[in-house]
């Protein structure tokens, strides 16, 4: 599918990997709806690209809000061809250990929160975007849409304290193939990207020496990943019709140590 003149929705599109994807897609001629809770950053991005980017405040876990966001995208741009899910949270806690200074079992509400945002939020976007995509006129390949979800290397190399996060990202990886099979008859592809350690707002608060140390753990290139590299891969997935039902590690060959 050619990104030029395509319509995409990007969750978590106001910052980090999502923002880079929005900017890259717009540069290739797409129009993009940014679904995010960060109103200031989302609105600023839309102001930067008038007529090309629309910001819609959206909680990806809320069925009604996501459906309303898709409806607004359809009203504004006329279709949804691509959906990229970048919205997510990172929370750490051991199965048994200290949480908020108290020794005990992993807080169940914390585990549920991570699963709700990362997994259920991603699935919510996928199912509702796919329903909108199946009405699209197919291209010459019979293709109607592309869905790209964000997993993580933690799905495969989860570290100490990452049980909830790894579970959420592992589930995203696991549902990629069956979702692709489910949607094949509609001409909709499903892929996932599993990023390694990237320069994102989540790492921005760390001291420079800590970020450099993290980058040196990557075999090659020995640095943190750049958000635009995620965006380039997302664009390549959209434009290559044979990429379907697979999880691509984007990590410089890193394999995470236990801690």
Predicted regions and their residues:
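Canonical Rossmann dinucleotide-binding motif of NAD(H)/NADP(H)-dependent dehydrogenases/reductases
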Residues: 2-33
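Catalytic Tyr-X3-Lys loop
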Residues: 89, 103-126, 147-148, 172
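Short, small/polar-rich loop/turn modules that mediate ligand/substrate recognition or access, typified
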Residues: 184, 189, 243-246
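Alpha-helical segment proximal to the catalytic Tyr-Lys
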Residues: 131, 180-182
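The beta1-alpha1 cofactor-binding region of Rossmann-like NAD(H)/NADP(H)-dependent oxidoreductases
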Residues: 39-40, 57-69
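Conserved mid-core segment of classical short-chain dehydrogenase/reductases
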Residues: 89-112, 131, 135-141, 161-164, ...
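C-terminal substrate-recognition "lid" of short-chain dehydrogenase/reductases
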Residues: 2, 226-250, 255
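Residue(s) in the substrate-gating loop at a strand-loop-helix junction
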Residues: 152
